[in-house]
Regions:
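C-terminal motif of bacterial Sec signal peptides marking the signal peptidase cleavage site
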Residues: 32-34
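Sec-exported extracytoplasmic/periplasmic mature domains
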Residues: 111, 115-119, 145, 210-214
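Surface-exposed short loop/turn segments
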Residues: 36-56, 117-170
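Short secondary-structure boundary motifs at beta->alpha junctions and helix caps
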Residues: 88-97, 168-211
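N-terminal secretory signal peptides that target proteins for export/translocation
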Residues: 1-18
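Sec-dependent signal peptide recognition
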Residues: 19-25
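N-terminal segment of the mature soluble domain
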Residues: 61-132
Length: 215
């Protein structure tokens, strides 16, 4: 058995399921308690927080930003929370999940933060009837809970932004590209604390990224 006590031990469940289905339930009850504190086998669903829209009207500068697409690195693109348990070892937790896949879950929060930056008259999604003057492609290379050091668990989030001019509503030359990384210590070893850490990481990243929007 892993020293992480099966921290979301998907591998163990798959390994024994065809031999002893009842044993899987018993194993899971103990295994899943090793990383996060929560009732055993209770499925929890979470979402990124969307910031409140600022009451002041956006600048009438004619700048319309369209989020062309959001992509999340394949290891972290599913609904299940992912935990780092070794230098090159990660495990998925089927009992702590995003409500929808992360790339969809991040759409509204990112749009809200970009709109609140005060740099754009509007921030739209791909396919909007509103013609953009700028486009942004957003990628998320890292999105996981780091439990490699069991005494210092943390929420890890990295986001990269690539802005393009769009004089005709289509991508033109690249204007800027920047990546931001945040590591937030967890206040508790719970899925809710991990989600809170990711939300704080997102807030800090968007505060840092606000100056990109001003280019």
């Amino acid at each position: 058995m892993s020293k992480y006590h099966g921290l979301c031990a998907v591998r163990y469940g798959k390994h024994v399921a065809h031999k002893a289905p009842l044993m899987v339930i018993a194993l899971a009850a103990g295994l899943f308690a090793g990383c996060l504190s929560r009732p055993a086998l209770t499925r929890q669903l979470f979402t990124f927080a969307t910031p409140a829209t600022r009451s002041s009207a956006g600048p009438k500068n004619g700048r319309v930003l369209a989020i062309r697409h959001i992509s999340v690195a394949a290891p972290f693109a599913g609904q299940s929370f992912v935990y780092r348990t070794g230098e090159l070892a990660y495990e998925q937790d089927p009992y702590a999940q995003f409500l929808v896949v992360p790339e969809e879950d991040l759409q509204e929060p990112l749009r809200g933060y970009l709109l609140n930056s005060g740099q754009f008259e509007a921030v739209t999604e791909a396919g909007s009837a509103l013609k953009p003057t700028l486009l942004v492609e957003i990628s998320v290379p890292q999105l996981y809970g780091d439990f490699l050091n069991r005494t210092e668990p943390a929420a890890v989030l990295e986001i990269s932004f690539t802005f393009f001019g769009a004089p005709n509503g289509l991508p033109d030359k690249m204007i800027s590209q920047k990546s931001y990384h945040q590591r937030i210590p967890l206040k508790a070893r719970t899925a809710a604390a991990l989600m809170a850490g990711w939300n704080e990481a997102l807030r800090r990243i968007m505060d840092q990224a606000a100056h990109i929007a001003a280019m």
